[in-house]
Amino acid sequence: MKIVVKVGGSAIVQGLDAQRFKDYADVIKQLAEDHTILIVIGGGTPARDYINVSKQLGANNSILDYIGIGVSRLNARLLISALGDIAYPEPPYDYKDAGLAMYSGKVVVMGGVVPGQTTDAVAAILAEYVHADLLIRTTSVDGVFTADPKLDPKATKIDSMTPQELVDMVTKIEMTAGANNIFDPLGAQIVKRSRIPTVVVNGKQPENLIKAVKGEPIGTIIKE
């Protein structure tokens, strides 16, 4: 299969622990033995820290977006280092470059692309561009919930939903540079348009990627 994985920054780069990158690299190496893998990595806490400081310095939203993109590309380079020779050596700057890099036979790792697009949207657009068979979105919780489980103890996990239900849910969420949400509105719209099966899993356990690829009941499945 051709698989695009959105690795949430909150799942891998919080605290910038080298072991987390190694753990993800080990799982990705296993998947790459049988599948074509493209990774989009978010900015995580480091991006939000830089963005918060930039806000205090008076930076506008476009500048904040560029800062987030820059940090996500640094995170991509860290994962490339952890993957070693199986990784394409440079994070692509756009979807066309990523598509071309894919034909090298290497694992492609990239960050953000343009202002106004979160890495959720980048992953969804990339999946559509390369005709992926599966999109996996990792996050810091066990899937999509009826509310933020960190704030609402009554929130329940949704085992499966349609792309339209995802769109309806996320359009109520305000998106800002560095925002940490389950999915962004543009990404959700692309998932709906492309009809690519999508699974949202807890990224704190990298092995969940393998379970999602195997079709095991994990996280939230988004499909028609």
From Swiss-Prot:
- What's one Pfam family the UniProt record gives for this protein? AA_kinase
GO biological process: one example: 'de novo' CTP biosynthetic process
Give details on activation and inhibition.
Answer: Inhibited by UTP.
Q: Which UniProt keywords apply?
A: ATP-binding, Cytoplasm, Kinase, Nucleotide-binding, Pyrimidine biosynthesis, Transferase
> Which EC number(s) does UniProt give?
2.7.4.22
Cellular component terms per the entry's GO annotation: cytoplasm
Which pathway features in its UniProt record? Pyrimidine metabolism; CTP biosynthesis via de novo pathway; UDP from UMP (UMPK route): step 1/1
**Which residues span the membrane?**
none
Catalytic activity reported: UMP + ATP = UDP + ADP
Q: Which domain of life is it from?
A: Archaea
- UniProt: UMP binding residues: G43, D65, V113, V114, P115, G116, Q117, T118, T119
Cellular localisation: Cytoplasm
Q: Give residues annotated as binding ATP.
A: G9, S10, G44, R48, T139, F145, D148
What protein family is recorded?
Belongs to the UMP kinase family.
The record describes the protein's role as:
Catalyzes the reversible phosphorylation of UMP to UDP.
Q: What is this protein called?
A: Uridylate kinase
Could you tell me which species this protein originates from? Methanocella arvoryzae (strain DSM 22066 / NBRC 105507 / MRE50)
- The gene from which this protein is expressed is pyrH
